[in-house]
Amino acid sequence: MNNKPMLNAYPDSLGGKLSDIAALLKKKEMQDTFSSFYILPSLYHSDLDRGFSVVDYNLNEELATIEDLSQLKELGIDLKLDFILNHASAQSPQFKDLVEKGDESEYRDFFIDWNKFWEGHGVMTDEGYIQPDESCLKQMFFRKPGLPILMVEFPDGRRVPYWNTFYQEVHGREYLGQMDLNIKSEKVWDFYRETLEKIASYGAAIVRLDAFAYAPKAPGKKNFLNDPETWEFLQQIHELAAPLGLTLLPEIHAAYEEKIYKTLADKGYATYDFFLPGLIIDAIENRRADYLAKWAREIVEDKISTVNMLGCHDGIPLLDLKGLLPEDDIRSLIDLIVSRGGMVKNLHGQKNIYYQVNATYYSALGESDSKMLLARAI
């Protein structure tokens, strides 16, 4: 990776297909503008979360073809593609096989059986799932209210709880959502290996590891960035990726004050983090560069390699700013963006805490063309 600008786009962001973006990048005016291109994951077959709920990693040929990817490579542009390590869609062939065959499915342990995981660390409820001990719950990091469970109905009528950190929707025995993978299953590691090989075959140079920090789990742990399990897991993924010529880019969505980015840098990884969007809004709206410059200075002095962006499908990250901006300034930033139409998304645990503001970057800047151009220039 280098320090030149990276284009971030969905396959249908400019025109209706990836071929339209390739045609744009071929224009004389665009030559040498971008050294790399992050193609977001609706490139694959997906069903939710703007591409981040992957059904399978085959190309969605309604939007992109291998010829499109080859054209981009011929322009000298490195491709960055996603691999979502923690979960797969409830519409994935593995999960559909589990729903269809139950205990007879070869993917019975591909996903995390909640009761098997918590056996010996909680009490069975009348609803058929184990309620973890309070000592364990106090340690856990939650992404939504309640326990992260999806009750899956097997063919014999039994309802079996499976770990479901993110979205879920249930209609009888039809499921939508993102089901957590059991990284202790050999089949999951076969899946990881095959997927990395497939991504490499598309010509990718960089693989962004989405949600990797949720994958290692253990009773009594936070189950987000577990130490040392997360770093051991990342090393195993590296050992699969390196022979394929793939550079890993772990995604970190955590408070600056936790210094996870420094841990990754110390272990030799670049990071995909979310500090820049809020810092630039703060700099522009408050007419000051202090906090933005302090962060940039740290990156340069400590030789930290990082990939940043401004807008994303989730909105403007805020939790990440803790330790970078004073708390009152973060709250003021939230109020400003909400006054411009944004909506606050909270995390759920023992108490609600802000996570991000759902808004486009243009809206967050008050729909000002000059501010948007300045943000992009920075």
Language-model features, listed with the residues they occupy:
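Active-site and adjacent substrate-binding regions of carbohydrate-active enzymes
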Residues: 1-378
